[in-house]
Design a protein with these regions (language model features):
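Short acidic, glycine-rich loop/turn motifs
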Residues: 38-45, 112-116, 200, 217, ...
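Short, contiguous, well-structured surface segments enriched in hydrophobic/aromatic residues
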Residues: 39, 59-60
Length: 245
């Protein structure tokens, strides 16, 4: 599915940054890959580093794609949601559902690295499942038949023994009747970043030089990565950014 890449005027700085990074790395097939982490956190996150946390257990991680970027309603385009597709049968989603039984939303940490522009985003997110049927149908219809089949399986008890060799054909035939309706296993997880650490790494310090002999190189002056912290202020409904180094 093609990302919504048009950025309206005066949008939030996080959305501007992440869309710019996605566009500049879109030639890479894995440019939309996102790592999401969930764990039981004992202490609140440190103000200047997303890594100084104490976990009560090993964090549960999942790698997925950013399928779309949307504006959160009633925030005047200042708060952004990252849409991800998941299968409800995965351990990751089952764990989140257990967590949400007595909570309104789940805190997740997401990270993405862009090799071409040498950038890294680490995001503290509020996360929730989208339950609006119209929205679910919209994204479900964006999938092709093969992608839809990944969210559906046929109970072996419902397949006759003499048809076992054609199980794949039976699956396609079975699912073709239901493919217009979203699978019960299809879920939309929306990540809403509220605190973002953006690191821009310098290009390699040693580069080839046309005036040097083979295997010789020119050493460039050492440069440090630039680190920025972006925070969403709910009361003011605006983002602010500070450079950390």
């Amino acid at each position: 599915m093609k990302l919504s890449i048009e950025t309206p005027p005066n949008t939030n700085i996080f959305k501007q940054g992440i869309i710019k990074s996605l566009n500049e790395n879109k030639q890479l097939i894995f440019s939309k890959k996102l790592t999401i982490c969930h764990s039981s956190i004992k202490n609140s996150i440190n103000n200047n580093s997303p890594l100084k946390e104490e976990y009560s257990e090993f964090p549960l991680m999942e790698i997925t794609d950013i399928k779309d970027i949307i504006d959160i309603p009633n925030t005047e385009g200042k708060l952004t949601g990252l849409i991800c597709f998941f299968d409800k049968r995965t351990l990751f989603i089952e764990t989140i559902n257990d967590y949400l039984k007595d909570k309104e939303y789940i805190p997740l940490t997401a990270s993405i690295y862009f090799p071409l522009t040498r950038e890294k985003y680490i995001m503290n997110c509020k996360s929730e499942f989208i339950k609006d049927e119209k929205i679910i149908n919209k994204y479900w219809s964006s999938l092709n038949e093969e992608e839809k089949l990944q969210y559906e399986t046929v109970d072996k008890d419902s397949i006759k023994p003499d048809n076992d060799k054609n199980e794949k054909d039976d699956l396609v035939k079975y699912f073709a009747q239901e493919q217009k309706l979203p699978s019960k296993n299809f879920s939309l997880l929306m990540l809403i970043p509220i605190k973002v650490w953006h690191t821009i790494f310098p290009m390699p310090q040693v580069i080839a030089h046309i005036n040097k002999k083979k295997f010789e190189s020119l050493l460039k002056p050492h440069k440090m990565p630039k680190k920025f912290l972006m925070n969403y202020d709910k009361e003011k409904n605006e983002w602010n950014s500070v450079q950390l180094n």
